[in-house]
Amino acid sequence: MSNMLEITLIKSTIGATEKQCAVVRGLGLRRLHQTVTLQDSPETRGMISKINHMLKVK
């Protein structure tokens, strides 16, 4: 399971740009404090880096 990431949305998308909201939806996050488990890939890492101030990653 070392190649999996647990991503939690910790900041609301209210006030975020449209692109940031699209990245949140692209990661499969819909609600505040929702956690998803995704495979660790360059694509996922790139999306995380765009909105890292809104996420908690394990």
Curated annotation (Swiss-Prot):
GO BP annotations, alphabetical order: translation
Gene3D superfamilies attached to this UniProt entry: Ribosomal protein L30, ferredoxin-like fold domain
Keyword line: Ribonucleoprotein, Ribosomal protein
Highest taxon above the source species: Bacteria
GO molecular function per UniProt: structural constituent of ribosome
Pfam families: Ribosomal_L30
Any single GO CC term annotated in Swiss-Prot or TrEMBL for this entry: cytosolic large ribosomal subunit
Cross-referenced InterPro entries: Ribo_uL30_ferredoxin-like_sf, Ribosomal_uL30_bac-type, Ribosomal_uL30_ferredoxin-like
PANTHER family xref list: LARGE RIBOSOMAL SUBUNIT PROTEIN UL30M, MITOCHONDRIAL RIBOSOMAL PROTEIN L30
Description of how the protein assembles with itself and partners: Part of the 50S ribosomal subunit.
Similarity field: Belongs to the universal ribosomal protein uL30 family.
Name of the protein this chain belongs to: Large ribosomal subunit protein uL30
Organismal lineage: Bacteria, Pseudomonadati, Thermodesulfobacteriota, Desulfuromonadia, Geobacterales
